[in-house]
Amino acid sequence: MDDGELEFSNSNMGGELPSCSMDSFFDELLRDSHACTHTHTCNPPGPENTHTHTCLHVHTKILPDKVSTDDTSESSGKKRPLGNREAVRKYREKKKAKAASLEDEVMRLKAVNNQLLKRLQGQAALEAEVTRLKCLLVDIRGRIDGEIGAFPYQKPAVTNVPYSYMMHPCNMQCDVDNLYCLQNGNNGEGASMNEQGLNGCEFDQLECLANQNLAGKEIPVCSNGIGTFTVNGSGVNKRKGEPRAAKAV
C-alpha cells in the first residue's frame, strides 16, 4: 500500500485468472459430452495484469429430443407399418384377382368370336352352293329346251309310220275347255269319240282313234267349236304308253 500498489488478500489474484483462460474453456468442453456453443464478454478491458475483469459465459446446449419409452407409443409405431403392409398386400391380391378374371373374360370372348366366324364362313359356303345349284339348274333347263326344240316343239316320232307326228302337249292353247274328236266311221258322222270331252292340255289321255281300215284315207277331225284339228290315223293298233298322234290344221 505504501508503494502505491494494490494488495490482494488472495495470493492467486496476482496471477492470471483461471476462469478466463483457454485451458478452463477446453476443460469444460471436454467435461461436457454434449456439443455446445458459447459466447463470453470480458468487462472491463484494460492494461494487462493491472486490472480485474469478470467473464460472463452463456452456454447453449443442443440436445436431442427425449425418446419416450412408453409401451403404447412403441406398439402404435410398430403397428402402423404392419397395417400398411397388410393393406398393400390385400390391394395387390385384389389386383391380381381382377386381372385373372379379365383374362378369363377375354378367353371366353375369343371363343365366342371364333364360333361366330365359323358360322359366317358356313353361311357364305351355303350361299355359294345355292348360287352354283341355281346356275346348274338354268344350264339343265337350257339343255332340255335345246333337246326338245323351239316352238312349236314338233318333230317326227316314228319315221316308218305314215301320217304320224308327235306334237308337244302345250302346242295347243290351254284355255280350250272341251275338245271332241269326231270321225266318219261306224259310229256315224259327227259322233264324239268315246263320248269324252278333253281339256286342251290333256293330250296324253286323248283316245281319238281313227278307223283302222281308213289309214291314210280318212282322217278324223277334232274340233272345239272354234278351230279344227286333224287327227292322224294309223293302221296299227295303239297300245297304252305309245304316243297319240295329232296334227293341228
UniProtKB/Swiss-Prot annotation:
Subcellular location field: Nucleus
Gene Ontology biological process terms, A to Z: DNA-templated transcription; response to zinc ion
Residue ranges, annotated region (Basic motif): 78-98
UniProt entry keywords in alphabetical sequence: DNA-binding, Nucleus, Transcription, Transcription regulation
InterPro entries tied to this protein: bZIP, bZIP_sf, C/EBP
One Pfam match: bZIP_2
Disulfide feature: none
PROSITE patterns: BZIP (PS50217)
Positions of the UniProt region annotated as Leucine-zipper: 102-116
All copies of domain bZIP, residue ranges: 74-121
Induction conditions: Induced by zinc deficiency.
GO molecular function: DNA binding; DNA-binding transcription factor activity
Gene Ontology CC: one annotated term: nucleus
Gene3D superfamilies reported in the protein's UniProt record: 1.20.5.170
Result of knocking out the encoding gene: No visible phenotype under normal growth conditions. Mutant seedlings grown under normal conditions accumulate reduced levels of zinc in roots. Mutant seedlings grown in zinc-depleted medium have reduced root length.
Region (Disordered): 66-90
Described function: Transcription factor involved in the response to zinc ion deficiency. Binds to the consensus sequence 5'-[AG]TGTCGACA[CT]-3' also called zinc deficiency response element (ZDRE). The ZDRE sequence is conserved in the plant kingdom and present in the promoters of genes that constitute the primary response to zinc deficiency, comprising additional ZIP metal transporter genes. Required for zinc accumulation in roots. Mediates the expression of the zinc transporter ZIP12 during growth in zinc-deficient conditions. ZIP12 transporter is involved in zinc uptake in roots.
Full protein name: Basic leucine zipper 23
Organism annotation: Arabidopsis thaliana (Mouse-ear cress)
